[in-house]
Structures are given as C-alpha cells and as structure tokens.
Amino acid sequence: MQSVPDSQNAGSISHAQCPSGLRRRLIAAAAAVTFSGLAVFGPAFAAAEAPLIGVVQLVDHEALNDSVRGITDGLKARGLAGSLDLQNAHGDQSTLKTIGDRFVHKDAKLIFAVATPAVQAMARATKTTPIVGAAVTSYTAAKVIASNEHPGGNVTGVSNIGPVAAQLDLFMKLVPNAKRVGTIYNAGEINSVVQIELLRAAAEQRGIELEEATVTNLTDLQSAVVSMSKKVDGFVFPTDNVVVAGMAVVLRTTVPAHQVTVSGDMGSLAAGCTAAMTVDYYKLGLQAAQLGADILEGRTTAAETPIGVQDVKNPTFNVTAMKRLGLEIPEDLKAGALLWQKK
C-alpha cells in the first residue's frame, strides 16, 4: 500500500476548498502567460500572435478542474499556453453554445472541451476548428466521431471511461454480503448512460440487484439519495457530473447511515466516499494537451488521432472513511492499494 502523493492527487483538496480557488489560480496563471507571450514563444513572436486556444469545462467540480489543470500545465510544457481563453459553462447548455460561438468568433485555433456535453456543444459550433476532448466517456456514443481508432472529423481526445465492473467488485469486497446496490445518475448525460449500462451488466453477471435513480439537479439528488439509502446496502457512483458536483449532498445521507460508497473519481473520494476506482483526471488533461499540441504544431490532425485511454488497476481508499466504518482493506487488495487521507 502507498499513500497518494500530493503531486498525483489534486483530490487531496476537498470540494469545499477546491472549485473557486482553483478557478482563480487557473485564471491567474492564464493571465500571466498571456502577458508573457514573448517569453513563451521566443523573440520571433509577439504576445498577440500566440495562437488562441479555447478551453471550456461543463461545470465546476474537482475531476473537471483537474483535467483543466492538466491541459494548462501540458500546454505550458509545450510552450503553447501563450493565449488561453478559459471558460466555464456552470452546467448551463445555453452557456455552452455561447462559449462555442465565442471561440469561433475569436478564431480560436484549437479548442479543448472538458466533459461530454461540452465536446458535443463545441462540435455543433464548428466543423473545422480542431477540438480535443477530456473527461468524455464515449465519443462514439456522443456522436462526435466516426470511431475511436479513426475519428474522421475535427474531434478527438481522451476518454475517462473507468473500470465500472471493477468499481462494483470493489464495493463487494467491502460489503461481501450486499444484496442490493444503489446508483444515481443524470439520464441526460450520454456518458452516464454508457457507464450505467456497464454497471447493470456487471450487477446482473454477479447476481446483485441494482437500484437506480435518475436526477437532473441537486434538489433531485438529495431526494433520490434519502429515499434510496433506505433500500440499499451501499452505493456505486460511476462518474456523473450532477452527482460528482453534489457529492457533499449525497454524503450528508450516506455517512450517518454508515453506508459504503465507491466512486469513479478522486474528488468524490476526497469529499468522503469510502473508496474509488478511477482514472487520473489530471493526467487525462496532460494527455489531451499533448494531443492538442501535436495537432496545433501540424504533426497530426484530429481526424487521424485515435481516442486515448487510461489503464486503471488499483483502488484508492479513504483512510478516514474506512476507519469510520470499521473496515479493513481486503488482503488481496493491499499490495496495490493507494491510501488517501486529508491533511
């Protein structure tokens, strides 16, 4: 077992601390590099000549913030962060459209779209500007590419598809006698639908009853978790933007009920979930930045750049949550387990 180092775990910052502060730091960093364009691009370029790069995220939560941080850091490493336009739709579809129109009007040379609705909105806004997605579960299900191997248009990116079956297996390791598992998601997000379909199949194969509830906002989420907590032995939460953004609401019910919660993102683990099987969203951002930089430098095109993925093998445990529930890490998971603890 090993502790999750701070450099690998932006999740060491809780939801209550992260979003606004991180957003301010990102904006400050973007402003700093914008005014230092000569230093970034060398004496042959003026700051105004740095290629405009648009970055849009769907909503403020830790997983998406981590991806944006990875994108900005990755672009800086490639000397391409001279003119970033960082935008947040705050979960509003009409705002996504406005942001897409903004990027097109400002003649952005590259667009990064973080989360499935964001990449869909950017794909509707332009068929020519290269778009690189991050924190997108299925680009084919989102109908923005032809195939993962040969995207074929102006969209490519990296997938955040996590090991959904392994998330359920992790839950069963912690609650071996569980008969019914709960999950909550927004049916309006195709990324969530894809993951829930995988979770259903995994539950059926393992003889576990899956209790589902769909939500569209935090009010729905609170009602759903209060009702469902009385019927299930615990929860598995593959990544859903409404649920992740409202994890504090979920935990206000599950923690007093002493229920195990397994998440698909580190932000939810930091908020108080028991354990997680998750991709590294910061590294997703770094991967996306490399794809985008290669496209911007003319090394490849979005059409011919395959969708990137991450291989997730090891679970992460919230030390405090495990102790609160009186749980020990299963022996067969100890060797590769990562431990997270708020500092």
Language model: regions and residue ranges:
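Short hydrophobic alpha-helices and adjacent helix-cap/hinge residues
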Residues: 2-4, 18-22, 27-31, 35-343
